[in-house]
Amino acid sequence: MALKFKFAIASDLHIALPHTIWQHPARFHLVEYSIPAFEEVLSQLATLDLDFLLLPGDLTQHGEPENHQWLSKRLAQLPYPVYVIAGNHDVPRVETFNQFTPHYTQFGFKSGLTEPHKPYYECEVFPNVRLIGLNSNQFDADGQQIGWIDDEQLVWLESVLENQDYALNLVTIHHNVLEHMHDQSRNALGQRYMLGNTERLCKILHQANVKLVFTGHLHVQDIAYSDRYDLYDITTGSLVSYPHPYRVLNYISDESGDRLEIASFRVKSIPEQADLSHFSREWMGDRSHPFVVRLLTHPPLNLSLEFAETLTPELRYFWAHIADGDAQFEFPNFPPVVREYLEAFSDVPPKDNNITLSLNK
Protein backbone atom coordinates (compact mmCIF):
# COMPACT_ATOMS: atom_id res chain seq x y z
CA MET A 1 0.00 0.00 0.00
CA ALA A 2 1.39 3.39 -1.04
CA LEU A 3 1.99 5.83 1.82
CA LYS A 4 3.49 9.28 2.01
CA PHE A 5 3.33 11.61 4.98
CA LYS A 6 5.43 14.26 6.68
CA PHE A 7 5.87 14.85 10.40
CA ALA A 8 8.18 16.69 12.77
CA ILE A 9 9.73 15.86 16.13
CA ALA A 10 10.64 18.29 18.90
CA SER A 11 11.68 16.65 22.14
CA ASP A 12 12.23 17.50 25.78
CA LEU A 13 10.78 21.01 25.56
CA HIS A 14 10.95 21.53 29.34
CA ILE A 15 8.50 24.42 29.04
CA ALA A 16 8.92 26.86 31.93
CA LEU A 17 7.03 30.10 32.35
CA PRO A 18 9.36 32.73 33.89
CA HIS A 19 7.81 32.65 37.36
CA THR A 20 8.14 28.84 37.56
CA ILE A 21 11.86 28.57 36.77
CA TRP A 22 13.93 26.75 39.37
CA GLN A 23 17.04 28.83 39.97
CA HIS A 24 20.12 26.79 40.81
CA PRO A 25 23.78 27.63 40.10
CA ALA A 26 24.43 24.20 38.55
CA ARG A 27 21.21 24.11 36.50
CA PHE A 28 21.97 22.25 33.26
CA HIS A 29 18.89 23.07 31.19
CA LEU A 30 18.36 26.49 29.63
CA VAL A 31 14.68 26.48 30.53
CA GLU A 32 14.52 30.28 30.40
CA TYR A 33 14.76 29.82 26.62
CA SER A 34 12.24 26.96 26.44
CA ILE A 35 9.34 29.05 25.14
CA PRO A 36 11.24 31.21 22.61
CA ALA A 37 13.08 28.12 21.30
CA PHE A 38 9.81 26.25 20.85
CA GLU A 39 8.23 29.28 19.19
CA GLU A 40 11.14 29.42 16.75
CA VAL A 41 10.58 25.77 15.86
CA LEU A 42 6.87 26.39 15.34
CA SER A 43 7.70 29.35 13.12
CA GLN A 44 9.90 27.15 10.94
CA LEU A 45 7.35 24.34 10.84
CA ALA A 46 4.65 26.78 9.75
CA THR A 47 6.21 26.84 6.29
CA LEU A 48 5.78 23.07 5.88
CA ASP A 49 2.78 20.94 5.01
CA LEU A 50 2.94 18.76 8.13
CA ASP A 51 0.64 15.86 8.86
CA PHE A 52 1.51 15.93 12.58
CA LEU A 53 4.03 16.95 15.23
CA LEU A 54 5.41 14.47 17.77
CA LEU A 55 6.64 15.50 21.25
CA PRO A 56 8.28 12.48 22.99
CA GLY A 57 8.08 13.60 26.62
CA ASP A 58 9.53 16.05 29.14
CA LEU A 59 7.07 18.64 27.98
CA THR A 60 7.56 20.78 31.09
CA GLN A 61 10.27 21.77 33.54
CA HIS A 62 8.99 19.76 36.52
CA GLY A 63 5.33 19.00 35.82
CA GLU A 64 4.02 22.38 36.97
CA PRO A 65 0.27 22.68 36.17
CA GLU A 66 0.67 26.18 34.74
CA ASN A 67 3.37 25.00 32.35
CA HIS A 68 1.17 22.13 31.16
CA GLN A 69 -1.69 24.59 30.75
CA TRP A 70 0.42 26.98 28.70
CA LEU A 71 1.65 24.20 26.42
CA SER A 72 -1.71 22.52 25.87
CA LYS A 73 -3.24 25.90 25.00
CA ARG A 74 -0.42 26.65 22.56
CA LEU A 75 -0.65 23.25 20.89
CA ALA A 76 -4.39 23.71 20.39
CA GLN A 77 -3.63 26.76 18.23
CA LEU A 78 -1.56 24.81 15.70
CA PRO A 79 -2.97 23.93 12.26
CA TYR A 80 -1.82 20.29 12.44
CA PRO A 81 -2.37 17.49 14.98
CA VAL A 82 0.11 17.09 17.83
CA TYR A 83 0.79 13.91 19.80
CA VAL A 84 2.55 13.85 23.16
CA ILE A 85 3.69 11.41 25.82
CA ALA A 86 4.85 11.92 29.38
CA GLY A 87 8.50 12.24 30.34
CA ASN A 88 9.99 11.82 33.79
CA HIS A 89 9.87 15.58 34.38
CA ASP A 90 6.14 15.64 33.60
CA VAL A 91 5.21 13.12 36.28
CA PRO A 92 7.71 13.68 39.12
CA ARG A 93 5.51 11.89 41.67
CA VAL A 94 3.10 8.95 41.49
CA GLU A 95 0.04 11.12 42.05
CA THR A 96 0.92 13.39 39.12
CA PHE A 97 -0.04 10.73 36.54
CA ASN A 98 -3.71 11.52 37.01
CA GLN A 99 -2.92 15.22 36.69
CA PHE A 100 -0.99 14.82 33.43
CA THR A 101 -3.34 13.17 30.97
CA PRO A 102 -6.31 15.59 31.35
CA HIS A 103 -4.11 18.38 29.97
CA TYR A 104 -3.54 16.47 26.73
CA THR A 105 -6.84 14.84 25.78
CA GLN A 106 -6.59 16.58 22.39
CA PHE A 107 -3.09 15.29 21.79
CA GLY A 108 -3.27 11.50 21.78
CA PHE A 109 -4.80 10.56 25.10
CA LYS A 110 -8.39 11.04 23.94
CA SER A 111 -8.38 7.52 22.50
CA GLY A 112 -7.90 6.17 26.03
CA LEU A 113 -10.95 7.78 27.58
CA THR A 114 -12.53 4.37 28.17
CA GLU A 115 -9.68 3.87 30.66
CA PRO A 116 -9.35 7.27 32.38
CA HIS A 117 -5.87 8.44 33.31
CA LYS A 118 -4.00 5.64 31.54
CA PRO A 119 -0.77 7.36 30.45
CA TYR A 120 -0.55 5.44 27.16
CA TYR A 121 -2.67 5.31 24.03
CA GLU A 122 -3.08 4.36 20.38
CA CYS A 123 -4.49 6.56 17.63
CA GLU A 124 -4.56 6.88 13.87
CA VAL A 125 -2.27 9.74 12.80
CA PHE A 126 -2.63 9.25 9.05
CA PRO A 127 -4.78 6.88 6.98
CA ASN A 128 -3.54 3.34 7.72
CA VAL A 129 -0.87 4.65 10.10
CA ARG A 130 -1.14 4.12 13.85
CA LEU A 131 0.87 5.80 16.60
CA ILE A 132 1.28 3.98 19.90
CA GLY A 133 2.30 6.24 22.77
CA LEU A 134 3.83 4.31 25.67
CA ASN A 135 4.60 5.29 29.25
CA SER A 136 8.06 4.41 30.59
CA ASN A 137 7.84 6.41 33.82
CA GLN A 138 7.55 4.18 36.88
CA PHE A 139 8.52 4.34 40.56
CA ASP A 140 10.39 1.76 42.61
CA ALA A 141 9.61 0.69 46.18
CA ASP A 142 11.52 3.71 47.50
CA GLY A 143 9.53 6.12 45.35
CA GLN A 144 12.44 6.73 42.97
CA GLN A 145 11.76 7.15 39.27
CA ILE A 146 12.87 4.37 36.94
CA GLY A 147 12.47 3.62 33.24
CA TRP A 148 10.17 0.63 33.02
CA ILE A 149 7.00 -0.57 31.28
CA ASP A 150 4.56 -2.26 33.64
CA ASP A 151 3.09 -5.67 32.86
CA GLU A 152 -0.44 -4.32 32.38
CA GLN A 153 0.78 -1.94 29.70
CA LEU A 154 2.78 -4.64 27.92
CA VAL A 155 -0.26 -6.92 27.82
CA TRP A 156 -2.26 -3.99 26.41
CA LEU A 157 0.45 -3.38 23.80
CA GLU A 158 0.44 -7.00 22.65
CA SER A 159 -3.33 -6.87 22.32
CA VAL A 160 -3.19 -3.62 20.36
CA LEU A 161 -0.56 -4.96 17.96
CA GLU A 162 -2.67 -8.02 17.24
CA ASN A 163 -4.94 -5.65 15.32
CA GLN A 164 -3.54 -5.80 11.81
CA ASP A 165 -5.83 -3.12 10.35
CA TYR A 166 -2.96 -0.66 9.91
CA ALA A 167 -0.26 -0.72 7.25
CA LEU A 168 2.24 0.91 9.61
CA ASN A 169 2.75 1.11 13.37
CA LEU A 170 4.90 3.85 14.91
CA VAL A 171 5.85 3.79 18.59
CA THR A 172 6.96 6.61 20.85
CA ILE A 173 8.32 6.24 24.38
CA HIS A 174 10.40 8.60 26.53
CA HIS A 175 13.22 6.31 27.69
CA ASN A 176 15.69 4.91 25.19
CA VAL A 177 14.99 1.43 23.88
CA LEU A 178 18.38 0.88 22.21
CA GLU A 179 21.80 2.13 23.29
CA HIS A 180 22.69 5.56 21.89
CA MET A 181 26.22 5.70 23.23
CA HIS A 182 28.94 3.22 24.05
CA ASP A 183 27.95 0.89 26.89
CA GLN A 184 24.92 3.05 27.71
CA SER A 185 23.06 0.37 29.63
CA ARG A 186 25.99 0.11 32.06
CA ASN A 187 27.98 3.36 32.09
CA ALA A 188 27.60 6.11 34.67
CA LEU A 189 26.47 8.69 32.12
CA GLY A 190 23.76 6.87 30.22
CA GLN A 191 22.31 4.02 32.25
CA ARG A 192 19.41 5.92 33.81
CA TYR A 193 18.17 6.99 30.38
CA MET A 194 17.60 3.40 29.25
CA LEU A 195 14.39 1.44 29.58
CA GLY A 196 14.98 -1.24 32.21
CA ASN A 197 12.98 -3.99 30.48
CA THR A 198 13.82 -3.05 26.93
CA GLU A 199 14.42 -6.65 25.80
CA ARG A 200 10.83 -7.59 26.50
CA LEU A 201 9.53 -4.54 24.64
CA CYS A 202 11.81 -5.15 21.67
CA LYS A 203 10.61 -8.75 21.35
CA ILE A 204 6.98 -7.61 21.30
CA LEU A 205 7.71 -4.96 18.67
CA HIS A 206 9.72 -7.35 16.52
CA GLN A 207 6.96 -9.95 16.55
CA ALA A 208 4.58 -7.27 15.24
CA ASN A 209 7.07 -6.03 12.60
CA VAL A 210 7.41 -2.60 14.22
CA LYS A 211 10.58 -0.97 12.88
CA LEU A 212 10.46 2.61 14.19
CA VAL A 213 10.55 3.89 17.76
CA PHE A 214 10.90 7.57 18.65
CA THR A 215 12.42 8.45 22.03
CA GLY A 216 13.78 11.42 23.98
CA HIS A 217 15.16 11.80 27.52
CA LEU A 218 18.89 11.59 26.70
CA HIS A 219 19.12 15.06 25.11
CA VAL A 220 21.27 13.87 22.20
CA GLN A 221 20.85 13.48 18.46
CA ASP A 222 21.25 9.81 17.70
CA ILE A 223 19.79 7.01 15.63
CA ALA A 224 20.47 3.47 16.82
CA TYR A 225 19.69 0.23 15.01
CA SER A 226 19.27 -3.32 16.27
CA ASP A 227 19.89 -5.99 13.65
CA ARG A 228 18.53 -8.59 16.05
CA TYR A 229 15.15 -6.86 16.23
CA ASP A 230 15.30 -4.97 12.91
CA LEU A 231 14.42 -1.87 14.91
CA TYR A 232 15.45 1.79 14.77
CA ASP A 233 15.40 3.96 17.89
CA ILE A 234 15.44 7.59 16.77
CA THR A 235 16.13 9.88 19.71
CA THR A 236 16.02 13.66 19.37
CA GLY A 237 17.92 16.18 21.47
CA SER A 238 16.31 18.72 23.77
CA LEU A 239 15.20 22.21 22.80
CA VAL A 240 16.65 23.56 26.07
CA SER A 241 20.19 22.25 25.62
CA TYR A 242 22.83 22.27 22.92
CA PRO A 243 22.37 21.93 19.99
CA HIS A 244 18.61 22.76 20.33
CA PRO A 245 17.59 20.38 17.52
CA TYR A 246 14.37 19.28 15.88
CA ARG A 247 13.64 16.91 13.03
CA VAL A 248 11.45 16.81 9.93
CA LEU A 249 10.71 13.34 8.59
CA ASN A 250 9.11 12.01 5.41
CA TYR A 251 7.80 8.45 5.36
CA ILE A 252 7.44 7.05 1.86
CA SER A 253 6.14 3.66 0.78
CA ASP A 254 5.96 3.08 -2.97
CA GLU A 255 7.13 0.71 -5.67
CA SER A 256 10.74 1.38 -4.60
CA GLY A 257 10.08 0.16 -1.07
CA ASP A 258 9.63 1.71 2.36
CA ARG A 259 11.93 4.45 3.61
CA LEU A 260 12.14 7.25 6.16
CA GLU A 261 13.86 10.47 5.13
CA ILE A 262 15.19 12.35 8.16
CA ALA A 263 16.41 15.95 8.15
CA SER A 264 17.63 17.65 11.32
CA PHE A 265 17.72 21.36 12.10
CA ARG A 266 18.88 23.56 14.98
CA VAL A 267 17.53 26.62 16.71
CA LYS A 268 20.61 28.82 16.39
CA SER A 269 19.20 32.17 17.44
CA ILE A 270 16.31 33.56 19.46
CA PRO A 271 15.50 37.17 20.40
CA GLU A 272 16.82 36.58 23.91
CA GLN A 273 20.13 35.08 22.72
CA ALA A 274 21.43 36.05 19.30
CA ASP A 275 24.10 33.31 19.20
CA LEU A 276 22.28 30.56 21.03
CA SER A 277 24.48 27.80 19.60
CA HIS A 278 27.71 29.27 20.99
CA PHE A 279 26.17 30.33 24.28
CA SER A 280 24.60 26.94 25.01
CA ARG A 281 27.70 24.99 23.97
CA GLU A 282 29.76 26.99 26.46
CA TRP A 283 27.00 26.62 29.08
CA MET A 284 27.14 22.85 28.62
CA GLY A 285 30.94 22.86 28.75
CA ASP A 286 30.89 24.87 31.98
CA ARG A 287 28.59 22.32 33.62
CA SER A 288 29.88 19.04 32.19
CA HIS A 289 32.77 18.59 34.62
CA PRO A 290 30.88 16.53 37.27
CA PHE A 291 29.49 14.19 34.61
CA VAL A 292 32.87 13.62 32.99
CA VAL A 293 34.52 12.98 36.37
CA ARG A 294 31.82 10.46 37.19
CA LEU A 295 32.40 8.65 33.91
CA LEU A 296 36.15 8.48 34.53
CA THR A 297 36.03 7.43 38.18
CA HIS A 298 33.30 4.77 37.84
CA PRO A 299 33.59 1.33 36.22
CA PRO A 300 35.10 0.27 33.95
CA LEU A 301 37.90 2.88 34.17
CA ASN A 302 37.83 3.44 37.95
CA LEU A 303 40.40 6.24 37.74
CA SER A 304 41.42 8.08 40.86
CA LEU A 305 39.80 11.47 41.28
CA GLU A 306 43.20 13.13 41.18
CA PHE A 307 44.12 11.54 37.85
CA ALA A 308 40.65 12.09 36.37
CA GLU A 309 40.95 15.80 37.08
CA THR A 310 44.06 15.99 34.87
CA LEU A 311 42.05 14.70 31.89
CA THR A 312 38.91 16.81 32.23
CA PRO A 313 40.15 19.98 30.43
CA GLU A 314 40.37 18.05 27.15
CA LEU A 315 36.88 16.66 27.77
CA ARG A 316 35.14 20.01 28.23
CA TYR A 317 33.06 19.54 25.06
CA PHE A 318 32.81 15.75 25.22
CA TRP A 319 29.10 15.76 26.01
CA ALA A 320 28.39 18.61 23.58
CA HIS A 321 29.94 16.56 20.75
CA ILE A 322 27.79 13.56 21.69
CA ALA A 323 24.66 15.72 21.92
CA ASP A 324 25.30 17.16 18.46
CA GLY A 325 25.28 13.70 16.88
CA ASP A 326 27.71 12.01 14.47
CA ALA A 327 30.61 12.59 16.89
CA GLN A 328 34.08 11.19 16.22
CA PHE A 329 36.66 11.24 19.02
CA GLU A 330 40.45 11.02 19.11
CA PHE A 331 42.47 11.32 22.32
CA PRO A 332 46.06 10.52 21.27
CA ASN A 333 47.55 11.95 24.48
CA PHE A 334 45.49 9.83 26.87
CA PRO A 335 46.70 6.52 28.37
CA PRO A 336 45.81 3.60 26.05
CA VAL A 337 43.05 2.15 28.24
CA VAL A 338 41.39 5.54 28.73
CA ARG A 339 41.87 6.45 25.09
CA GLU A 340 40.30 3.22 23.87
CA TYR A 341 37.31 3.59 26.17
CA LEU A 342 36.54 7.23 25.37
CA GLU A 343 37.11 6.88 21.63
CA ALA A 344 34.52 4.09 21.68
CA PHE A 345 31.96 6.85 22.25
CA SER A 346 32.46 7.85 18.61
CA ASP A 347 29.27 7.48 16.64
CA VAL A 348 28.61 4.28 14.72
CA PRO A 349 26.22 3.88 11.77
CA PRO A 350 23.61 4.93 11.01
CA LYS A 351 24.16 8.67 10.80
CA ASP A 352 22.35 10.68 13.45
CA ASN A 353 21.15 13.87 11.79
CA ASN A 354 20.45 13.60 8.08
CA ILE A 355 19.82 10.20 6.54
CA THR A 356 17.36 8.07 4.61
CA LEU A 357 16.59 4.80 6.37
CA SER A 358 15.63 1.83 4.22
CA LEU A 359 12.95 -0.25 5.95
CA ASN A 360 12.80 -3.18 3.54
CA LYS A 361 14.74 -5.87 5.43
Model-derived features: where do they sit?
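Beta-strand-turn-beta hairpins that frame and shape the catalytic cleft
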Residues: 1-8, 118, 122-133, 164-168, ...
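N-terminal active-site segment of His-dependent metallophosphoesterases
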Residues: 1-68
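Acidic/histidine-rich helix-loop elements
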Residues: 11-36, 92-113, 140-149, 185-190, ...
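Divalent metal-coordination and catalytic microenvironments
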Residues: 12, 53, 58, 71, ...
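Active-site environment of divalent metal-dependent phosphoester hydrolases
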Residues: 16-19, 61-64, 88-95, 139-142, ...
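His/acidic metal-ligating clusters that form di-metal
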Residues: 43-52, 130, 144-232, 318, ...
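Extended active-site neighborhood of metal-dependent phosphoesterases/phosphodiesterases
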Residues: 65, 69-156, 162, 248
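A short C-terminal boundary segment appended to hydrolase-like catalytic domains
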Residues: 255-361
